[in-house]
Every structure is written in C-alpha cells, then in structure tokens.
Amino acid sequence: QTSGRGRRQRQWTSIEGGYAGSWIVAEGVEINPGHLQLSGGLAVLNSLGLEQLTLKWPNDILIDGKKLCGILAEGRNIQQGMRVVLGIGMNLKTAIHDSDFEMAFLDEIYEIEFEEFDRRLHCELASLLEFRDDLPPVRHEEIRNQVLEKMKSLGLPRYNGTIFTDFDLNERGELLLGGEAIDDGEYITWV
C-alpha cells in the first residue's frame, strides 16, 4: 500500500521503512468496524509480543507515549451487504518525518524485517478474524478482555473533566464510561 488516509480524513503518509497494509476483512458478513479496529491493534501487539507497546483506545499503538502504529477500520454498504476494510500502518525503521506529533519507531526497541512482521501479522489477523463455516465464530468476549488488559497500562481515562476508575468496552468496540458509550477517542486522555 502506498497511499491512504487516517481517521477524520487526516493526512496519512507512508514513510520509508514503514509498514502499510489493508485487508478486506468482511464482505457480505456482519462485523463491526470498531471491534475490528481493536482486533487489528491486538493482532499487532500479539505479532510482536513486546511489553513496551501500549494499545491506546481506539486505534493507536504507542511506545513511551509516542505513536508507533495506527489502525483504521471502515465499513461501506455494497450490493452484497457490507464491505469492511482494515488498514494498519507502522513505523518499523527510524526515518526522517515531518509529522505534527511525536512518532516512535520499532527499531528503537526491536529489530524485525518487513517480511517477518507481515507474516506474523497475517497469522494473528487470521487467528482472530477468519470467517468460515467450519471454524468457531469470532471470539468477541476473548478479544475484548485481551484489549482491556492491554489498555490498563495507559492508566485511567479522563473524559469531560472526569477521571473514570472503571471502564469497559462493548461489542462494538466503544469505550464505556459511567454508562455512556464513547466511540471517538479524540476527547479521551489517559492519566
């Protein structure tokens, strides 16, 4: 993949030494993009197995508070039903960039070749998301529990000035805070 976009139509660029991939995950099958986005983040974390990585709800992976990876899932209605695409972009190798935010690079803490990361990520995505009649259904509860465990390393969410000591995720991947379902991380900070 050589082009794309981020959330809210933000500019997305592929820097040298980076990884960018897109998958048509569901076509004519019901799957929620929010849940898929979290599953994509979990697949990245599982493919690397590094404790230093943090999953920042809803779609980023961080190293020491700096963005390493972004995940975007988007659904569109098509003639056969719904088509859902998952996109993942990650900074594998240190490179010069002109980003507005601090970026992290995987090679600062771990060396992996592009092909090896790609192979591992495909395996993890397949294990989490493959749809076939002869396989058990997608394990939403198991994925939710793993994502929540990874999110705990960020601290507690602050939303509208309130810090929440208890938070959860629903089956759509929305953050549950005080009985409210939040679908956008733009106004959430972690303390």
Region roles according to the model:
Residues 1-11:
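Basic, glycine/proline-rich low-complexity segments that contact nucleic acids
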Residues 10-13, 17-18, 22-191:
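Catalytic beta-strand/loop module used to bind and position nucleotide/cofactor moieties
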